[in-house]
Each structure stands twice: as C-alpha cells, then as structure tokens.
C-alpha cells in the first residue's frame, strides 16, 4: 500500500488499477538483447502493413499539419455511413476503439453501478470499469468464450453496461449471430450492451452477424470497430462506434476535441475504400492460420479455435517460460497469464515467412524442455 499523500489523492478505482501491458515493442527487445531481424507476432497487427492508398492519403495531408484536424471527422463519417448504410449521426470516432470503451464508461457508469463481462475478456474492460469506480462482475467462461446464459443471470438492478467481444480477444471464440441477438433482445433497456467487433473483418463471411442492422431495433446497443487490425493503421489510433443517434450525441459530449489527428482521418478514409488490400489481408490471415494450425498438429499441441487474426496455443507448461525462450530467438508473442491462461501463448498471424520462423523456434525450444 502506497502511503504517499499524493497517491492518496487519486480515486480509489485508479489506485487499484493494474495498468494495461501491451505487447513488447521490437525496439525494446533490440535494446535489451542487441538482436536484429526480430519478428513480432504479439499485438494482432496487420503483417501486410497499411493500404497503399492510406499511405498516399497521409502524404497528401502532410502539408496541412499546422492546422487542426476536422474535429467532427466529417469525411470519414460520410465514408463510414456510405459503406455500412448507417446515418452519420450514429457514428462516434475514437482514438482507437479503446477510447470508445472509455467514453462509454465515463458517459454511463458511476461508482454505484456494475459492469458485466466474461472471464478471459479483453483487459481494457476492467480498466475502464475500475477507472470510474464501478464494480466489475466477471462471469465464468464457457470453453474460453462467453456464456450468455451465465451473463443473463449476472445482470442486476445495478448493471449499467455489458461488454461482449465477438470474436473475443485473446481466445478468438465466436458467438453465433442469432444467439447474440437473442441475448441483446432480452437485456433490460437500462443496460447498455457494447459489442466489441475489433476483429470483425476476419470472421468468415458465412459467420458474420448483421450486427449493424440491429441498431434500429435495440437503442441500448453500441458496436465498436477499429482500423488497427484488418486495416493496418494501429500506429495512427483510430476506431469508430455505431449506436443510436442519441447515444452518439452523449458520447460526443465527453469526447475530447480533435481526438483524431488529420493523418489518421485521411488514412482511415482511404483504407476503408481499398477493398483489394482488405481482401489480401483476409486471405493472408486464412492461409497463415492454416499454416500455424498445421504446425501445432505436428508438435501435438492443442489450441483454441479462433475467428480472429490470432490463435492461443496450449503449451501444457508455463507459457511465460516459453515466451522468454522465444524472445532469446528474436520472436515476440503474447503471454496471456494475466487472462488466467498461464499455459497458453497468443500468436498473431504473420506473413508465411514470419509464421515459419516462429514455428521453427517453438519446435526447437520444445525439443529441449
């Protein structure tokens, strides 16, 4: 317990927060071990990089850097409205979809409320919950995914928000659209359902829910998506939320002005219209997933079936130890003990060459433990 008087000034929820730990940066491992040619399969980034159209849009915007960006993101909202057939008034732009999760908590949740989510769910959910002083209600998982029946039972008069990621991170589990919509339709209208679809583009088309069409039926639904994953713009930090116009208006009241820089706005608009690059990204992910799963079969390892651009593999021993051994070989993956999965590692899908380097390194390590 820190007894410093300045520490005591912080809100109780902030004092108890465990900071989010991101995947290790390549530069950090270079500094620590003096390695080169490091590959990073830790943060579910796009191994093909951003769309060439996005890069061109950034270059065309550089001359205007002395100016403030459009604080309302007019052009990007218009592009999103056209692509997804929703009203611009239903769109909220965020500095990554993570900011939207924080805006939702700040807008709707206070210390007397509860926020419900699943075990093995994205680490930002407890962070934004604790930051506003609310109580996190963590529901046991079903086969590493969401148990919607258990979540229903966990909802009380104090529940204000339910977070559901589909696919879930870090497990990759996917809920069927009809099952998910049935759950949302049963929710009390006083409970906000946040459907986190950061990995939506990687879901096989036949399994993609028509979730945006639900917005007209469920005024308590918010859907968040991001440009960080399939669109390859993680370094620019931009995402968007879709909801009723009323919810969007409320979120925009607490959103910081100019929360999206002009490079991000221009790149996101261009990336949204580069269908060829998105298709290449999805195809690379499908092929890479198959490559990794074939490798796991060869090593007689189990994994959690994933609908995202990552897969969590069960090593049947300390994931942290294997993670550290991989670092020595210049391969960065993601330990997930903080998600109560101490024997798993989460592997982002890379290029064919990156995937093979990882599999070769893993095989060599497992041969000596």
Task: Please report, for each region that a protein language model flagged, where it lies by residue.
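Active-site pre-lysine segment of PLP-dependent enzymes
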Residues: 148-158, 170-193, 197-228
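PLP-dependent enzyme catalytic core of the Aspartate aminotransferase-like
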Residues: 325-329, 333-334, 338-369
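N-terminal "arm"/small-domain region of PLP-dependent enzymes with the aminotransferase-like
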Residues: 2-67
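Conserved PLP-binding catalytic core of the aspartate aminotransferase-like
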Residues: 286, 295-329
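Short acidic capping loops at alpha-helix termini that bridge into adjacent secondary structure
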Residues: 37, 87-91, 111-114, 158, ...
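Phosphate-binding glycine-rich loop
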Residues: 66-114, 132
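PLP-dependent aminotransferase-like
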Residues: 107-164
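PLP-dependent aminotransferase class I/II
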Residues: 51, 72, 220-304
């Amino acid at each position: 317990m820190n007894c410093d008087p300045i520490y005591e000034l912080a809100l109780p929820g902030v004092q108890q927060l465990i900071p989010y730990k991101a995947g290790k940066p390549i530069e950090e491992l270079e500094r620590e071990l003096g390695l080169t040619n490091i590959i990073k399969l830790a943060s579910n980034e796009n191994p093909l990089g951003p769309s060439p159209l996005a890069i061109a849009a950034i270059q065309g915007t550089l001359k205007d850097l002395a100016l403030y960006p459009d604080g309302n993101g007019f052009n990007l909202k218009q592009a999103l409205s056209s692509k997804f057939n929703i009203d611009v008034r239903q769109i909220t732009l965020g500095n990554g979809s993570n900011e939207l999760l924080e805006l939702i908590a700040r807008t709707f949740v206070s210390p007397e409320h509860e926020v419900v989510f699943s075990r093995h769910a994205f680490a930002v959910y407890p962070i934004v919950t604790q930051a506003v002083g609310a109580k996190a209600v963590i529901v046991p998982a079903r086969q590493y995914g969401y148990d919607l029946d258990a979540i229903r039972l966990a909802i009380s008069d104090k529940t204000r928000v339910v977070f559901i990621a589909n696919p879930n991170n870090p497990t990759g589990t996917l809920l069927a659209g009809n099952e998910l919509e049935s759950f949302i339709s049963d929710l009390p209208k006083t409970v906000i359902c946040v459907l986190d679809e950061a990995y939506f583009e990687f879901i096989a088309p036949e399994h993609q829910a028509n979730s945006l069409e639900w917005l007209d039926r469920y005024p308590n639904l918010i859907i968040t998506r991001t440009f960080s994953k399939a669109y390859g713009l993680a370094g620019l930090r931009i995402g968007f939320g879709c909801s009723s116009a009323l919810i969007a208006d409320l979120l925009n009241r607490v959103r910081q002005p100019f929360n999206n820089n002009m490079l991000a706005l221009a790149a996101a608009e261009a990336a949204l219209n580069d269908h060829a690059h998105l298709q290449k990204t999805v195809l690379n992910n499908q092929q890479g997933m198959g490559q990794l799963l074939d490798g796991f079969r060869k090593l007689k390892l189990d994994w959690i079936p994933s609908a995202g651009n990552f897969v969590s593999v069960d090593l049947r021993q300390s994931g942290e130890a294997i993670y550290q051994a991989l670092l020595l070989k210049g391969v960065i993956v993601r330990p997930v003990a903080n998600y109560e999965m101490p024997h798993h590692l989460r592997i982002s899908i890379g290029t064919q060459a990156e995937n093979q380097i990882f599999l070769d390194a893993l095989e060599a390590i497992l041969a000596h433990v």
